[in-house]
Amino acid sequence: MLPINNNFSLPQNSFYNTISGTYADYFSAWDKWEKQALPGEERDEAVSRLKECLINNSDELRLDRLNLSSLPDNLPAQITLLNVSYNQLTNLPELPVTLKKLYSASNKLSELPVLPPALESLQVQHNELENLPALPDSLLTMNISYNEIVSLPSLPQALKNLRATRNFLTELPAFSEGNNPVVREYFFDRNQISHIPESILNLRNECSIHISDNPLSSHALQALQRLTSSPDYHGPRIYFSMSDGQQNTLHRPLADAVTAWFPENKQSDVSQIWHAFEHEEHANTFSAFLDRLSDTVSARNTSGFREQVAAWLEKLSASAELRQQSFAVAADATESCEDRVALTWNNLRKTLLVHQASEGLFDNDTGALLSLGREMFRLEILEDIARDKVRTLHFVDEIEVYLAFQTMLAEKLQLSTAVKEMRFYGVSGVTANDLRTAEAMVRSREENEFTDWFSLWGPWHAVLKRTEADRWAQAEEQKYEMLENEYSQRVADRLKASGLSGDADAEREAGAQVMRETEQQIYRQLTDEVLALRLSENGSQLHHS
């Protein structure tokens, strides 16, 4: 960075003397602007950067994070990048016609000036914009999220990436016809959009449109699902959610939300305990999650569900670590539909069981630990399958896809952590054939991969450290001895074989692979030894139906 000096003087040579009048006009205006600074503004630093930019003929001007309430009217005419983000700006001056990139996020802008004709990137998220000016044809990327925009102007043909999340848009813009080669990704999540224009089908199938958490009518959802399910469909991939985006942001005190799950004779004691956790991180959203959980299909229809939740809450009250993990898992669950809450409940039960395993609950019950590990493995495979399924769908709510595989296969795969009912299976796009294929794939991969996976599972390592300390120490010594004696040569051999010797990125990747292979070999040997001993003693078995 150049030395800071607010008292720039013009060099006394013929070149600068020729244009000194121009410089003087800039400097005089900037010095006057600096003297009008409000308390807390760093206008002296801003003027220093302005003068440096002008004298050095720099194409970038960065005035971000200076707490500025305004900018001078005459910005350097040659700049192609202007960054004024994280200030207190309520408006912008006339922008240089040369400007290609404008960053003015996290200000208080209510409107924008005329945009330069060559502008390629507009980043004005987190402001107070209610509308936008005409967008230049050159625009490639635009982020206008977290504003108050009700409608959009015509979108340039060149626009590749648009983020308009959390505004007040009531409709999508028209999408132009023709075989435009541009691959687009547009985000309109969490607006007020109730219908989808037919022009959305003009976009190519490589394009993606995100419209989650909007009040889409059931008619619009059904029509889109029908269109996108057609074998002849060649339009964009559309990501939606069954949420209408209108969840109540009010929440009641955490203790009240918790005690509602307990019988009346316990509520006073429970309230007193949970009152102490009111100010923990994510406590408010956890309270809202509990209230939404009570309105799920499982809560209404599953016998013993309330008792199950109450028992879980008791465990949370006794463990700060588990409570912190659970609050974090539930943090976003209230921002989507009922099935998102159900999927989060699945994840919370997984968190509890893995925590209990790590803390020693299964130290003396290897069979139960294997069963838990097997369930976690099956869930991981189902997540992989769901992820692949999402890629094949053109109209998709990812939450419904992930939950569908868990819910519909809960009984066949003995998934104790999965809810047995979901509300919107019909829009998941998961077919009966998908479920049969998924079950077969899980069982096949379990047969071939589970023991390797289990040998690297964190809770199993925690059990080994506590109950097989000597064997664990020997395994660690063997691992580090192998790394010390063989690691470098194995990495070098791998790089040479691939013709990437001397490539730093390839070396890091090869090193990670060698490390994984070493750990797999050592921990698999240890696991086989311990399981052979323990399972023969209690009659359990490694392979399970």
Swiss-Prot record:
Its main location: secreted. The lineage of its organism: Bacteria, Pseudomonadati, Pseudomonadota, Gammaproteobacteria, Enterobacterales. GO terms for molecular function: ubiquitin protein ligase activity; ubiquitin-protein transferase activity. Keywords: Host cytoplasm, Host nucleus, Leucine-rich repeat, Plasmid, Repeat, Secreted, Transferase, Ubl conjugation, Ubl conjugation pathway, Virulence. It catalyses: S-ubiquitinyl-[E2 ubiquitin-conjugating enzyme]-L-cysteine + [acceptor protein]-L-lysine = [E2 ubiquitin-conjugating enzyme]-L-cysteine + N(6)-ubiquitinyl-[acceptor protein]-L-lysine. Residues 1-242 are annotated as: Interaction with target proteins. Residues 251-545 are annotated as: E3 ubiquitin-protein ligase catalytic domain. LRR repeats lie at residues 57-77, 78-99, 100-117, 118-139, 140-157, 158-179, 182-203, 205-228. One of its GO terms (biological process) is protein K27-linked ubiquitination. It comes from Shigella sonnei (strain Ss046). Ubiquitinated in the presence of host E1 ubiquitin-activating enzyme, E2 ubiquitin-conjugating enzyme and ubiquitin. This is E3 ubiquitin-protein ligase ipaH9.8. SUPFAM superfamilies: L domain-like (SSF52058). NCBIfam families: IpaH_Shig. GO terms for cellular component: extracellular region; host cell cytosol; host cell nucleus. Residues 243-250 are annotated as: Linker. It is found in: Secreted; Host cytoplasm; Host nucleus. It comes from the Bacteria. Exists in an autoinhibited state in the absence of substrate protein, due to interactions of the leucine-rich repeats with NEL domain. Is activated upon binding to a substrate protein. The active site is at C337 (glycyl thioester intermediate). The LRR (leucine-rich repeat) repeats are involved in substrate recognition with target proteins. Gene3D superfamilies: 1.20.58.90, Ribonuclease Inhibitor (3.80.10.10), Shigella T3SS effector IpaH defines (1.20.58.360), Shigella T3SS effector IpaH domain (1.20.1270.130). Also interacts with human and mouse U2AF1 (U2AF35). Residues 253-545 form the NEL domain. Effector E3 ubiquitin ligase that interferes with host's ubiquitination pathway and modulates the acute inflammatory responses, thus facilitating bacterial colonization within the host cell. Interacts with IKBKG (NEMO) and TNIP1 (ABIN-1), a ubiquitin-binding adapter protein, which results in TNIP1-dependent 'Lys-27'-linked polyubiquitination of IKBKG. Consequently, polyubiquitinated IKBKG undergoes proteasome-dependent degradation, which perturbs NF-kappa-B activation during bacterial infection. Mediates polyubiquitination of host U2AF1, leading to its proteasomal degradation.
